[in-house]
Amino acid sequence: MAVRLILSVVVGLALSLSPAAYAMKQLELKSHSHIAAIDFPLSGKEKAWLAAQPTLTVGTWLPERTPIVYDGDEKSYQGINADYLALMAHSLGLKVIIRQYDTEQQALTALADRQVDTLLTQVAHRDALAPGLDQSAPLLKTWPTLVTSLKSPLPPLTTDRRVTLACTRDCAFFDIIQQAFPNAKITLYDSDYQALASVVSGENQYFIGNNITTGHCISKYFSQSLVIAHYFRQQEQHNRFVTRDDRPELHQLLDRFIHA
């Protein structure tokens, strides 16, 4: 009886620590862009490494941001990231598998447990890393953008007056807001769409967000009512590959491809 009890505890613990315990979806990489392979010369060492590892498992985590990743299809991974990964797969002769986790911590745990080879971070991701990890050069670079309504004359790009400004709850640009609009009344929204709609309705005078997701949302929903009035050339954000520091060959290959 005691032996059975011990075995049941051990099995339960093993299951709780298994990869299946992660809140993870394996997605099909899907690209809608015409892919022409990059002329990417490989050393003999790199060719041998690729031959030994024909599959690259990439981890990501939610929430993703459109158009960097489209969230309409729960079975496939599409968007700017997917186009880039498809180009890399085609150029290097790799099969790329996407594993999407619910949280960043789950993705980091999967990387530490070797369930994935690398992580592709969020664009708003911080640059600081935990010990034992390396990061690649940036894939995408984004900048803060200031949006106003087309219905009214162009308002000032900086003022000490009280203005109303919208941004999303995960906004990373409060330092810029403080510099440009120190007396702004800021309202936070769950999405770019909701925040931008508040400028259309006149509830807010301005919106600040990154140029990629903001530009996509305006072109899709608000092209007749909103305009990007200014790009702030500071506080740029990136997304990067993250690898374990015991995978130097992978880290170097990813960096070389980004710079190709």
Label the model's feature ranges.
Residues 23-123, 127-131, 185-189, 196-197:
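Extracytoplasmic small-molecule ligand-binding "clamshell" domains
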Residues 24-46, 82-91, 151-174, 178, ...:
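Extended ligand-binding regions for polar small-molecule ligands
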Residues 57-63, 133-156, 169, 240-245:
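Hydrophobic/proline-rich hinge and linker segments of small-molecule sensing/allosteric domains
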Residues 61-65, 103, 123-125, 149-152, ...:
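Solvent-exposed coil/turn segments that connect beta secondary-structure elements
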Residues 69-73, 82-95, 135-137, 158-161, ...:
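Ligand-binding cleft/hinge of the Venus flytrap
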